């Protein structure tokens, strides 16, 4: 299956499919004429006498240097090779595929001036599985993601490195094995390929998709913890949340209420329970997870716009002029990444407090210490809770905003930058930590519910426990725990736990 992209209107759902499934993509042929028109205009400018930035001049601080017509192709090649300054481990294939798809969307708007053969090469590389090797570090998020995108482009011109069928090869070899030929870049094409926010945006989108799946699963594990602790569902009453009015809170409250419907555990303590109120980590789940959901939705709107944007420079306007601007500055992406980081941090923080509640016999309303029937002889989930605390603390440190930092670069020509790329990249580690925290809560919540037998939980939550137990058997005696934690985190990350819940209960990213 090939996804047909309509530049300017590619929805989040399609972007997530590209990220998760690695499907090949193509630009809708209806956009080809506009692409070729802009390319023809760039060719006209390159053949003329007037200096135009990036077409017949140097770059950055060197923009005042005029380039001879005979050197234009060399200029573009030199630009790519000199900008391949990335360091660190290679970005994963699914991230690079998304970067390439986003670059297609941007170029496909017909304002960048690249020839159609550049577009078709990217499409063919995605179809045949030639994935450029892009180091993870080196971008400050303005002027675009220069170093990462230069590594992408290097493979296109037969330089650099690329992955093909599991092998890490030179760019030329990877293209050759796939039956493809490198492109010779024409005027402005190198600049159009590297000057954009696609790396930052792809990383931020990946973080967004992972965070959304995590918050949906956190609502499930939060409901499990509520039932395990014999908490009240009264704070999830719809009118409470309607009176405040925040959409995320309303949706989170509804999800929690629905997940707990029919629980025999809940019915067992409707009367005679001397506790007046539950701790905040139980009672305030709609307010906290709902606020996180709202901020993820806000970030989603920003990133959907950015994913469809033209972010290189200069741009070919509708009147045929090539005009320099600053769309390459990734400040919107940096802000969105910071928002996502805050949400990820808070989802994990309140989940960790519920884990701590369930393993503490002074708070768990009758559950044994550390959820083991033989405390002392067995330690149960004691250190799993400690691990969740370590991960929570790590995420708090990483949640510091990246966008508030800036440093002058390129001899002060590029004197304010967004730091969007590493602000977005850290989301991968933060969401991995979050998945592990929520996975631990799944273990504590499920075990807590099982320890309430013969009382049973709701039908929806019973499905979640069954999905968990298919991979992680109930903890009866102490055993090697690392495999349990890994399996539980994977069930969060791959959507298994959220996938068993009936449609319409868990909140969507687009509200």
UniProtKB/Swiss-Prot annotation:
Modifications after synthesis and translation: Contains an active site 4-methylidene-imidazol-5-one (MIO), which is formed autocatalytically by cyclization and dehydration of residues Ala-Ser-Gly.
PANTHER family, A to Z: HISTIDINE AMMONIA-LYASE
Catalyzed reactions: L-histidine = trans-urocanate + NH4(+)
Primary localization class, coarse: cytoplasm
InterPro entries xref list: Aromatic_Lyase (IPR001106), Fumarase/histidase_N (IPR024083), HutH (IPR005921), L-Aspartase-like (IPR008948), Phe/His_NH3-lyase_AS (IPR022313)
GO MF, one annotated term: histidine ammonia-lyase activity
Enzyme class: lyase
Keyword vocabulary terms for this entry: Cytoplasm, Histidine metabolism, Lyase
Pathway given in the UniProt record: Amino-acid degradation; L-histidine degradation into L-glutamate; N-formimidoyl-L-glutamate from L-histidine: step 1/3
Family named by the database record: Belongs to the PAL/histidase family.
Gene Ontology cellular component annotations, sorted alphabetically: cytoplasm
Pfam families the UniProt entry points to: Lyase_aromatic (PF00221)
Subcellular location: Cytoplasm
Range of residues in the leader sequence: none
EC assignment: 4.3.1.3
Protein name, per record: Histidine ammonia-lyase
Covalent crosslink: 5-imidazolinone (Ala-Gly): 142-144
Name of encoding gene: hutH
Residues modified as 2,3-didehydroalanine (Ser): 143
């Amino acid at each position: 299956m090939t996804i047909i992209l309509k530049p300017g209107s590619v929805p989040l759902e399609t972007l997530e499919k590209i990220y998760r499934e690695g499907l090949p993509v193509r630009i809708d042929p209806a956009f080809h004429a506009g692409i070729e028109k802009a390319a023809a205009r760039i060719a006209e400018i390159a053949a003329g006498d007037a200096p135009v930035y990036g077409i017949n001049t140097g770059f950055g601080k060197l923009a005042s240097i005029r380039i001879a017509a005979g050197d234009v192709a060399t200029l573009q090649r030199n630009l790519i090779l000199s900008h391949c300054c990335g360091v660190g481990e290679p970005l994963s294939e699914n991230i690079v595929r998304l970067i390439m798809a986003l670059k297609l969307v941007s170029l496909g708007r017909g304002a960048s001036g690249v020839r159609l053969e550049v577009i078709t090469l990217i499409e063919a590389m995605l179809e045949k599985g030639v994935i450029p090797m892009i180091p993870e570090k080196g971008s400050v998020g303005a002027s675009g993601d220069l170093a990462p995108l230069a590594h992408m482009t290097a493979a296109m011109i037969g330089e650099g490195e690329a992955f093909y069928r599991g092998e890490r090869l030179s760019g030329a070899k990877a293209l050759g094995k796939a039956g493809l030929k490198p492109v010779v870049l024409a005027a402005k094409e190198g600049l159009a390929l590297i000057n954009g926010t696609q790396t930052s945006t792809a990383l931020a989108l990946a973080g967004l998709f992972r965070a959304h799946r995590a918050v949906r699963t956190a609502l499930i594990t939060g409901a499990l913890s509520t039932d395990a602790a014999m908490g009240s569902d009264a704070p999830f009453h719809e009118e409470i949340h309607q009176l405040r009015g925040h959409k995320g809170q309303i949706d989170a409250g509804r999800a929690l209420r629905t997940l707990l419907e029919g629980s025999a555990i809940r019915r067992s303590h409707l009367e005679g329970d001397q506790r007046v109120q539950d701790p905040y980590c139980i009672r305030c789940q709609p307010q906290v997870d709902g606020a996180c959901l709202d901020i993820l939705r806000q970030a989603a709107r920003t990133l959907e716009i950015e994913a469809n944007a033209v972010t290189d420079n200069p741009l070919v306007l509708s009147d045929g002029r090539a005009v320099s601007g600053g769309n390459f500055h990734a400040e919107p992406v940096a802000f969105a990444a910071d928002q996502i980081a805050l949400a990820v941090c808070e989802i994990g923080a309140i989940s960790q407090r519920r884990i701590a509640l369930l393993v503490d016999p002074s708070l768990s309303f009758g559950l044994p210490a550390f959820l083991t029937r033989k405390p002392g002889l067995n330690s149960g989930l004691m250190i799993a809770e400690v691990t969740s605390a370590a991960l929570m603390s790590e995420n708090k440190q990483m949640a510091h905003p990246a966008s508030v930092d800036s440093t002058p670069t390129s001899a002060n020509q590029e004197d304010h930058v967004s730091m969007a790329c590493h602000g977005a990249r850290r989301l991968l580690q933060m969401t991995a930590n979050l998945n592990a925290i929520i996975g631990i809560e799944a273990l504590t919540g499920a075990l807590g519910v099982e320890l309430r037998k013969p009382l049973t939980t709701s039908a929806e939550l019973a499905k979640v426990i069954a999905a968990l137990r298919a991979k992680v058997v109930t903890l009866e005696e102490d055993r090697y725990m690392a495999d349990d934690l890994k399996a539980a985190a994977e069930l969060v990350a791959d959507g298994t736990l959220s996938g068993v819940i009936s449609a319409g209960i868990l909140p969507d990213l687009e509200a």
